[in-house]
Amino acid sequence: MKKVVVGLSGGVDSSVSAYLLKEQGYEVIGLFMKNWHDDSVTISDECPWLDDSNDAMMVADKLGIPFQTVDLSEQYKERIVDYMFNEYEKGRTPNPDVLCNREIKFDVFMKIALSLGADYVATGHYCRKAEFEKDGEPIYQLLSGEDNNKDQSYFLCQLTQEQLSKTLFPIGELQKSEVRKIAAEQNLVTAEKKDSQGLCFIGKVRLPDFLQQKLKSKEGVIVEVPAGNDSYLEEDINFKSKIDQLQHLSKKFNYQLTDGKVVGKHQGAHYFTKGQRKGLAVGGTPEPLFVIDTDVIENVIYTGQGKDHPGIYRQGLFIAQDEVHWVRRDLAIDSDEELRIKARIRYRQPLQDATLHQTENGMYVIFDQPQASITEGQFVAWYQNGELLGSGVIS
């Protein structure tokens, strides 16, 4: 009998995953990860991990499976929290959920599970795995979940073949409504529980409060750049080379204070991210202001009016070579090669038609249509036929 450790998070998805695996005849162990101690920055009096841990324990009890808690808060602080602070300080916007899966759930946690004699680790992610042989070697595919509305393959875009080989996704074929129905039929305490929101494992966190622990607030100005700014003019360029053209399509606008007018003050450019609308506290404009860029060195936030402002859009992005990751290493392209794909630059974004261009220094992703708020530090993931092939950090 194969042994599976299920990461029981105290939510309905992992609860039903554990139930399904038990039904399929696996020996199932429930393991709850405690990853956060600091309650000073969570919103309201929620202490999410305590409630979640109790719910996970009750589910394990109901299913008659052994249950343990592991405290990974130290690794979590080192690998996720510190990384987040560093990224925000550099003016990048990290994605804690993608990191959490790569660094914690499918690394630290997986190693603990395997040391307990597990053959597999299972999670409640809405995605699927398939396997086939190529040249005598097994190849593992990471596929979108059947529930289009809930597909979470994006969060797993940094997984490796080794990690996939040891992973099971029991609810990947189901719709969310079916998962809740199973939980209700089995009288699991999590059946009606709301989906968790917020930073992976931390519960509801006020981001500025969270960041203020490490990043000092510092007053700066908010500049509004008019849509008619010269830098948005389309010029006819004769590119000397393909690389020149790729660089042009993916380069960000470089703003100066003289590009617009000062319309307000802020408490730190590193608290803001591209596309953000809330928290600017500037009124009196016909259309709402959106962040189009942040300059953490000069501590300036550049904004534009309305969601169609040209400063929001860009047609391409670049990934440094050491941040290009192929889930399907066998499909990686060589320098000067191209690949037609579909890509997304954030969770739940509908897939966009694009082309990958591999160069010696890294990968360009050029979209057929300009994309809103391409954000440094976030992940772009690329797909073909519902399979996630690879990903990278937007630089």
UniProtKB/Swiss-Prot annotation:
Disulfide bonds join C100-C200. It comes from Christiangramia forsetii (strain DSM 17595 / CGMCC 1.15422 / KT0803). GO terms for cellular component: cytoplasm. Its main location: cytoplasm. GO terms for biological process: tRNA wobble position uridine thiolation. It comes from the Bacteria. Catalyzes the 2-thiolation of uridine at the wobble position (U34) of tRNA, leading to the formation of s(2)U34. It catalyses: S-sulfanyl-L-cysteinyl-[protein] + uridine(34) in tRNA + AH2 + ATP = 2-thiouridine(34) in tRNA + L-cysteinyl-[protein] + A + AMP + diphosphate + H(+). PANTHER family: MITOCHONDRIAL TRNA-SPECIFIC 2-THIOURIDYLASE 1, TRNA 5-METHYLAMINOMETHYL-2-THIOURIDYLATE -METHYLTRANSFERASE. Residues 150-152, 346-347 are annotated as: Interaction with tRNA. The record marks H125, Q378 as: Interaction with tRNA. The active site is at C100, C200. Residues 95-97 are annotated as: Interaction with target base in tRNA. ATP binds at G7, L8, S9, G10, G11, V12, D13, S14, M33, G124. Belongs to the MnmA/TRMU family. Its EC number is 2.8.1.13. The gene is mnmA. Keywords: ATP-binding, Cytoplasm, Disulfide bond, Nucleotide-binding, RNA-binding, Transferase, tRNA processing, tRNA-binding. It is found in: Cytoplasm. It is an enzyme of class 2 (transferase). HAMAP family: tRNA_thiouridyl_MnmA. This is tRNA-specific 2-thiouridylase MnmA. NCBIfam families: PRK00143.1, trmU. Pfam families: tRNA_Me_trans (PF03054), tRNA_Me_trans_C (PF20258), tRNA_Me_trans_M (PF20259).
